[in-house]
């Protein structure tokens, strides 16, 4: 049936956005932006119709969640770093059918997962920053999956990924890329640091 055509661990460092703007950081993240453009190129070459982003800035306290609204559009300001990302425009198509399917198969495999196809919840910057460079023309549909899970078992996260692959390959009529958006480990500089 469906195909998982590409999987990647990617950055979403907010200074990518600052790198576009006039000021002292202009151009400093061009290499990261070029990397995202290459992933975009590879997804298009593979015929990807939907990008599923595991977003490490979407914090949840119970279950796994899939933001699969039919459309995401607005202005985004980061509640974590409003001095880095402020009023960043976004406009992406969603994929409610795939989101509901992913949740259904995950639940069948014992992983409590909720799809949200009729929500006003906007994606977080772990989704929006990469899509700013990979989906400039609304070519792809986009899903966002909560990946900052405060009370989850690591083994359940692995099983969730396995269930998503089964859903895509066994039941979905299309081609998907999965992106793990976020650092494996990082720390922000302390206040008063130089």
Predicted features along the sequence, with ranges:
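Soluble secreted/lumenal catalytic domains
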Residues: 1-194
